């Protein structure tokens, strides 16, 4: 049917008074628990409780996996609901801002920023040190580093930014160290460096930072760290209060170790505290010695996992992590190959390690799209002599039942008070492990 239409719209009677001509928007999880979107309301009939949206959601309305599943959403930018301190309404047509201050403006100042550019941007710089600085109250990113080398952002405070804290792309030997990054619109740190084809390390790091209260504007990307490229490190960070997971990574030979992560996955489902996925060639990454606790596991869908090797991610090592309560699963191995899950401690979880075989249902080897894992591997020249030597099992993937989760090693893990230590999906055979 028409995905722009909702029936039996459950809402307060005050919605009957909303002036949709001013522009009313609804933000929520319209279909899946891992995809939120803001959609404009077009019309609303208070008699039938029928609402029509101005645009279609990418996945439609209603979860096809759960019949009659209730979808969560809320209204934003509603002039008639401006009724408590801290709220505001922007009348774009008349260029007027209505704002109810949360307190005494003489004691607590309010800032309005018009700066859409990064507060500091460096391109091609080297031996640059940013130390003991405060970056705050911008509409965009706080710091952007492009193709820089040997730079350090150290002991800085980044807060109240519209987008992200520190974004570093390209170059090598760049480091974000002992900073506090909080109350930003998207992620705290985005770091991409290194060459996957040549497996040259970026040698960049995110170390010893406090990253919290993130994703105020963009829930889906509101993590502590997004890491990409080859040969970078995320260590000794304290990450908490994120709408989605704590760290996501892609690429090769990254080291994610000795981090403490708690109170993340606050609003998202089917999410990982440490997350990667959908790439056979994303190999050689190590997630070790992290302490993961007090995570939110929202009901419905796939919930949250401490380490999520999603959509046939392969060739990673998960070792020596402590996972204490909160998450639905300690490790979700989603159909991947040649992963090692060893020596982890899982305490008080519904499921310790969960393995499924989604490959036959999802992977394609001859059609375009993100599920063509052979094409993704070919992009990094996975059959080159260098890659054959580094990842010999990957070089043989097409010869060894490529769609099945084979070659994984699960050993020496400890489960305390877990309802189901090992959860194997019905289509997984024990001899594959």
Task: Describe each PLM feature range.
Residues 1, 8-147, 152, 159, ...:
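Extracellular polysaccharide-degrading/modifying enzymes targeting complex plant/algal/animal polysaccharides
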Residues 6, 126, 149, 172, ...:
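Hydrophobic (often cysteine-bearing) scaffold residues that line and stabilize catalytic clefts
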Residues 140-145, 159-169, 182-433:
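Glycine- and acidic/polar-rich repeat regions and solenoidal domains
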Residues 129, 175, 205:
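Conserved beta-strand immediately N-terminal to the Walker
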Residues 148-154, 173-177:
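Transmembrane beta-barrel wall of Gram-negative outer-membrane proteins
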Residues 13-16, 75-77, 83-87, 105-108, ...:
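Intrinsically disordered, low-complexity boundary segments flanking structured domains
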Residues 32-35, 81-82, 181, 239, ...:
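A short catalytic or substrate-binding loop motif that flags glycine-/basic-rich loops and adjacent residues
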């Amino acid at each position: 049917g028409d995905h722009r239409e909702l029936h039996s719209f459950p809402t307060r009677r005050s919605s009957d008074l909303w002036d949709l001509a001013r522009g009313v928007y609804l933000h929520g999880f319209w279909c899946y628990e891992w995809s939120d979107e803001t959609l404009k309301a077009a019309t609303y009939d208070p008699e039938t409780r029928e609402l029509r949206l101005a645009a279609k959601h990418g996945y439609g309305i209603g979860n096809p996996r759960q019949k009659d599943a209730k979808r969560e959403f809320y209204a934003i930018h509603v002039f008639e609901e401006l009724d408590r301190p801290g709220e505001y309404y922007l009348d774009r047509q008349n260029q007027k801002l209505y704002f109810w201050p949360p307190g005494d403006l003489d004691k607590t100042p309010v800032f309005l920023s018009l700066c859409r550019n990064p507060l500091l941007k460096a391109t091609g710089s080297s031996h640059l040190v940013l130390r003991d600085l405060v970056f705050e109250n911008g509409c965009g990113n706080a710091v952007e580093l492009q193709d820089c080398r040997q730079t350090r952002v150290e002991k800085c405070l980044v807060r109240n930014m519209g987008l992200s804290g520190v974004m570093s792309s390209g170059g090598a030997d760049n480091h974000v160290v002992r900073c506090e990054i909080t109350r930003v619109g998207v992620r705290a740190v985005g770091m991409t460096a290194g060459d996957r084809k040549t497996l040259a390390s970026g040698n960049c790091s995110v170390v010893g930072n406090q990253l919290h209260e993130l994703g105020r504007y963009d829930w889906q990307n509101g993590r502590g760290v997004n890491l990409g490229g080859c040969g970078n490190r995320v260590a000794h960070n304290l990450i908490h209060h994120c709408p989605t997971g704590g760290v996501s990574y892609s690429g090769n030979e990254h080291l994610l170790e000795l981090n403490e992560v708690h109170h993340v996955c606050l609003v998202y489902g089917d999410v990982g505290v440490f997350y990667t996925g959908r790439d056979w060639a994303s190999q050689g990454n190590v997630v070790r010695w992290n302490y993961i606790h007090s995570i939110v596991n929202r009901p419905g869908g796939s919930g949250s996992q401490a380490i999520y090797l999603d959509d046939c991610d392969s060739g990673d090592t998960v070792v020596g992590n402590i996972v204490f309560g909160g998450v639905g699963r300690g490790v979700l191995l989603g159909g991947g190959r040649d992963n090692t899950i060893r020596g982890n401690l899982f305490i008080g979880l519904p499921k310790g390690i969960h393995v499924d075989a989604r490959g036959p249902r999802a992977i394609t080897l001859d059609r375009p799209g993100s599920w063509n894992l052979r094409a993704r591997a070919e992009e990094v020249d996975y059959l080159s002599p260098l890659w054959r030597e580094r990842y010999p099992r990957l070089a043989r993937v097409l010869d060894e039942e490529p769609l099945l989760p084979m070659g994984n090693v699960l050993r020496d893990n400890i489960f305390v008070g877990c309802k189901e230590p090992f959860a194997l999906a019905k289509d997984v055979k024990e001899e594959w492990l």
